[in-house]
């Protein structure tokens, strides 16, 4: 086991604070509408330019192990805020730094760190309560666009495209971000249910120009096993041919003789048919087949339910208004399923989302809800270069998360003003002893930090701006983008309540842990004057 170096008291805390400051100062420059970019080197490829606080924080590793501990703890603030709220990472980092810096003064003067922590917790709890009082719900598309634009570094085009996407797929809909092929951002909305499986044979194509197979008013056969023997399929094929309707087959796979027969029948015009593989794998495949069954009003033919392919009839088949099958995707539009059953299925999946422990599972379940209820919107990012596209994508992701947070918990005035207004309401707050009172004072001062950083990045004097904002009331604040004072909500400078709340909670949590640290242990540094390798004789 490697030797360890142990540091105590001020010696330990000082190095931690140095690490906190290095990381926070690098992240802080990105805050506000006039915040700057940070250039991140890559071991291969072009450097990455970003204005996203958590992306900057994740890149930072310090050489000194004690300083690195401080940096990693603040990195945790940014990461946790990004995970929960999706935005506000820079605000959280700035607040954490402010609480640590203020708190260290009191710790150095001999106050009890545990009581300081209790005071900090009391103040944060009171501020969050006040933020919830100040919060108002998002009522229209304009406010949605304003939240998104502000989070995307005041980019109104991004704000508008996100608001449009939300209007089209609803609050529960899935919005994905992809690389575009042009210079402009594009929004594509997939209505109906789309899954990532295409036709099993190009001979099913009905539109050679678009390379798609289109079935109008088809019946839908759902089977959870492979189909390789045409004899199993014949009874149902004959019934479909008599009904004079096209047929979509969704199965684990269709191969060999069965696929060849379907292709021949399709090409001769005897039966308009197309076959695709079922989406997903394992249990997820079964669940998605069941989703398609409910959406189309059909039944999954599976041995568990006592149904076999040979005995299947028209009663087991679902139907839809239209099915479009491409090389890689299948879209079922306007399925004939019972609305009450679809709603019940959506509620059941939502219950699974609440119980899910993994982010991946939660994301996949949310996709299923969207496919059943609203549809999927795809935002394609346009840019001239790959570096610009990555930077834009970062901002769109931030804006998307901020917008969802705003829809969830409402909005407050942005620009650090909500925290200052909440501060005014807790000035009279008292702790159980003078040390707890000092903890409350730490938070009161730290709440100014985001506005100070925004003003400093805009080239203004922070103290002057803070005092002018404090002279006003309600949503009156400083719009750093225009350099004007006024009602920030009317100006469209708004933050999601969830983002502001999460930023403060996480910042206070980590900062108070740093204040209560009295010893640090890290691997002892290696001798910097290590012997140079001996020169070789030639």
UniProtKB/Swiss-Prot annotation:
Keywords: ATP-binding, Chaperone, Cytoplasm, Isomerase, Nucleotide-binding. The keyword Nucleotide-binding applies. It is an enzyme of class 5 (isomerase). CDD domains: GroEL. It is found in: Cytoplasm. GO terms for cellular component: cytoplasm. GO terms for biological process: protein refolding. The keyword Cytoplasm applies. GO terms for molecular function: ATP binding; ATP-dependent protein folding chaperone; isomerase activity; unfolded protein binding. Its EC number is 5.6.1.7. This is Chaperonin GroEL 1. The gene is groEL1.
């Amino acid at each position: 086991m490697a030797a360890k170096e142990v540091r105590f008291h001020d010696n330990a805390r000082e190095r931690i604070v140095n690490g906190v400051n290095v990381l926070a100062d690098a992240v802080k420059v990105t805050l506000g509408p006039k915040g700057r970019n940070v250039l991140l080197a890559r071991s291969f490829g072009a450097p990455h330019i970003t204005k996203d606080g958590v992306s900057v924080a994740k890149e930072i590793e310090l050489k000194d192990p004690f300083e690195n501990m401080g940096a990693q703890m603040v990195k945790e603030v940014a990461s946790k805020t990004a995970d929960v709220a999706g935005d506000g990472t820079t605000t959280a980092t700035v607040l954490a730094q402010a609480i640590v810096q203020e708190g260290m003064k009191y710790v150095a003067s001999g106050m009890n760190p545990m009581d300081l922590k209790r005071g900090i917790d009391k103040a944060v709890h009171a501020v969050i309560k006040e933020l919830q009082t100040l919060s108002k719900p998002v009522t229209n598309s304009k406010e949605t666009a304003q939240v998104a634009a502000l989070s995307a570094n005041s980019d109104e085009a991004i704000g508008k495209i996100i608001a449009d996407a939300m209007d089209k797929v609803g609050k529960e809909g899935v919005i994905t971000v992809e690389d575009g092929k042009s210079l402009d951002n594009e929004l594509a909305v997939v209505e109906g249910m789309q899954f990532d499986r295409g036709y099993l044979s190009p001979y099913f194509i009905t539109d050679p120009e678009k390379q798609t197979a289109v079935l109008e008013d088809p019946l839908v056969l759902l089977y959870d096993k492979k189909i390789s023997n045409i004899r199993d399929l014949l009874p149902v094929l004959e019934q479909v041919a008599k009904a004079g309707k096209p047929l979509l087959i969704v199965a684990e796979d269709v191969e060999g003789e069965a696929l060849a027969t379907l292709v021949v029948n399709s090409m001769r015009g005897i039966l308009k048919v197309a076959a695709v593989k079922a989406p997903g794998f394992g249990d997820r495949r079964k669940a998605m087949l069941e989703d398609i069954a409910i959406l189309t009003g059909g039944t999954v033919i599976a041995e568990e339910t006592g149904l076999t392919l040979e005995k299947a009839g028209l009663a087991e088949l679902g139907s839809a208004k239209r099915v479009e099958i491409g090389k890689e995707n299948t879209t079922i539009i306007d399925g004939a399923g019972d609305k009450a059953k679809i709603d019940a299925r959506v509620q059941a999946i939502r219950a699974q989302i609440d119980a899910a422990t993994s982010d991946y599972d939660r994301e996949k379940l949310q996709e299923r809800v969207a496919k059943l209820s609203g549809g999927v919107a795809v935002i394609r990012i346009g840019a001239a270069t790959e570096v610009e596209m990555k930077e834009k994508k970062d901002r769109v992701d931030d804006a998307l998360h901020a917008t969802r947070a705003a829809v969830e918990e409402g909005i407050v005035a942005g620009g650090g003003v909500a925290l200052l207004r909440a501060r005014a309401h807790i000035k009279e707050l008292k702790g159980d002893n003078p040390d707890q009172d000092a903890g409350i004072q730490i938070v009161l001062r730290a709440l100014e930090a985001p506005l100070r950083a925004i003003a400093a990045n805009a080239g203004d004097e922070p103290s002057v701006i803070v005092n002018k904002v404090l002279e006003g009331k309600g949503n009156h604040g400083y719009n750093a983008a225009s350099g004007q004072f006024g009602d920030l909500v009317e100006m469209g400078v708004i933050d999601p309540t969830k983002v502001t709340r999460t930023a403060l909670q996480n910042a206070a949590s980590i900062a108070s842990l740093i204040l209560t640290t009295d010893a640090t242990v890290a691997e002892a540094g290696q001798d910097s004057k290590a012997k140079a390798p001996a020169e070789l004789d030639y």
